[in-house]
């Protein structure tokens, strides 16, 4: 049968328990459902084959008329577009404004990358084609990346260094000192946000990173040498790290310390990046 019986297994067991047997013959309800199914199959529309000779097309003259009308409508729309007043002056002024804003945004992104990038192989950041041309021509030096701290104590130092909060970006006016014409003369990507020059350079082959602090340079050079001087003092733990902030973050796993607290709720986290991910839920 195409339709399953409506009675459940519990009803079948009840019938067997009461009568001692179960009849396999279909009931009136099952006959009725089977009849409804057969009627639906019989009455539904079936796909039929249509030969190509039965397909009717419009007359050839009607087709040509439709094509000519469509062509005329297209020409009229083109004439309307061409008769509209020129907007070259508006486009040029908007383009110049976009160039200025893009240059400001590229400077902000390059400076903010100094405080957020982990120690890694040399990477060049170019936010637009104009920046790429300047880098290739030698007007800009290589990308400058500093070591971002992950512990809350050093985060305070970095926020004081920038003169703003941990989650705030410096304004373009603070980052760009002087006009756009003078920025090429100072030429450099060697100037730090607070005005000091980056004098500590990595001398390993192929690496051109520059830092303002010798401690940051030493921490970076350990990525080349593989040195890990910071050892976990927890009993039974022999983990070693190249940077002190990595050891601090690892040590919180033993102590269970969670110094990063959410300002919207009472949840605390042991790492600042975990707190940043959690804060996105409140947005």
Curated annotation (Swiss-Prot):
GO biological process entries: cellular response to endothelin; cellular response to hydrogen peroxide; cytokine-mediated signaling pathway; positive regulation of connective tissue replacement; positive regulation of transcription by RNA polymerase II; regulation of transcription by RNA polymerase II
A single GO cellular-component term on record: nucleus
Cellular compartments annotated: Nucleus
Zinc finger (C2H2-type) boundaries: 200-224, 230-254, 260-282
Compositionally biased tracts (Basic and acidic residues): 183-196
InterPro entries with a match to the protein in the record: Znf_C2H2_sf (IPR036236), Znf_C2H2_type (IPR013087)
Domain of life: Eukaryota
Compositional bias per record (Low complexity), positions renumbered to this chain: 102-113, 133-148
Positions occupied by motif 9aaTAD: 62-70
Keyword line: Activator, DNA-binding, Metal-binding, Nucleus, Repeat, Transcription, Transcription regulation, Zinc, Zinc-finger
Pfam families: zf-C2H2
One Gene Ontology term of the molecular function aspect: zinc ion binding
Span list, region Disordered: 102-198
UniProt cross-references to CDD domains, sorted A to Z: KLF6_N
Record remark: domains: The acidic N-terminal part may favor interaction with the basic domain of transcription factors. The 9aaTAD motif is a transactivation domain present in a large number of yeast and animal transcription factors. In KLF6, the motif is inactive.
Function: Transcriptional activator. Binds a GC box motif. Could play a role in B-cell growth and development.
Similarity comment: family membership: Belongs to the krueppel C2H2-type zinc-finger protein family.
Subunit structure: Interacts with ZZEF1.
Identification of the protein by name: Krueppel-like factor 6
Organism field: Rattus norvegicus
């Amino acid at each position: 049968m195409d339709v399953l019986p409506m009675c459940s297994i519990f009803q079948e067991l009840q019938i067997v328990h009461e009568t001692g047997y179960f009849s396999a013959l279909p009931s009136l309800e099952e006959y009725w459902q089977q009849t409804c199914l057969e009627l639906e199959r019989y009455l539904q529309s079936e796909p039929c084959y249509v030969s190509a000779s039965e397909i009717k097309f419009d007359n050839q003259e009607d087709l040509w008329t439709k094509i000519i009308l469509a062509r005329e409508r297209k020409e009229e729309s083109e004439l309307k577009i061409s008769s509209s007043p020129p907007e070259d002056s508006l486009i040029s002024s908007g383009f110049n404004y976009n160039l200025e804003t893009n240059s400001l945004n590229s400077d902000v992104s390059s400076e903010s990358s100094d405080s957020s990038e982990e120690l890694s192989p040399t990477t060049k950041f170019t936010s637009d084609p104009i920046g790429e041309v300047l880098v290739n021509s030698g007007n800009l030096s290589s990308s400058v990346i500093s070591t971002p701290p992950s512990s809350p104590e050093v985060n305070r130092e970095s926020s004081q260094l920038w003169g703003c909060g941990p989650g705030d970006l410096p304004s373009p006016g603070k980052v760009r000192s002087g006009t756009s014409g003078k920025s090429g003369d100072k030429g450099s990507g060697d100037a730090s946000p607070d005005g000091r020059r980056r004098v500590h350079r990595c001398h390993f082959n192929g690496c051109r990173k520059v830092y303002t602090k010798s401690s940051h340079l030493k921490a970076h050079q350990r990525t080349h040498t593989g040195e890990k001087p910071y050892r976990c003092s927890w009993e039974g733990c022999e983990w070693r790290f190249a940077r002190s902030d990595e050891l601090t973050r690892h040590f919180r796993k033993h102590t269970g310390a969670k110094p990063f607290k959410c300002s919207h709720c009472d949840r605390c986290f042991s790492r600042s990046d975990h707190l940043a991910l959690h804060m996105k839920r409140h947005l």
